[in-house]
Amino acid sequence: MFFRFPEDARWNADGQAVEFGVGIGEYEGVVRVPRQVFGRFIDGAVTPERCLEAYHLHRTRLERVVERKLRNRQLTDDGNVEVNGRDLRVLPRGASMAYSDFATR
């Protein structure tokens, strides 16, 4: 399976979230990462600009979470993907605690 993540990250003011596209095969969807999720990456005020900056700094990690959610068919009612704080705490299969400690810093 090849996932596609176009370079289209943007701030959604109505949803207070960073959104970006994802595709696999014929599926095309939108990933939403709410503002409060970025609080773990940002010291100080969690502004839209800083959320987008944090997205780019942690893009690979967020994309891996999205891949896992799509493989497990964890979609929202509208067929898209929403990443929450719990998704970022889940250990990948076979990962050690040392990896977990490193990944959350």
PLM segments and residue spans:
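Compositionally biased, intrinsically disordered low-complexity regions enriched in proline and serine
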Residues: 4-6, 28, 39, 56, ...
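A short, structured beta-strand/loop element
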Residues: 19-42
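Flexible, active-site-adjacent loop/turn segments at secondary-structure boundaries
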Residues: 3, 36-40, 86
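Acidic, low-complexity intrinsically disordered segments
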Residues: 46-105
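Intrinsically disordered, low-complexity regions enriched in Ser/Pro/Gly/Gln/His and often acidic
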Residues: 2-4, 34, 48
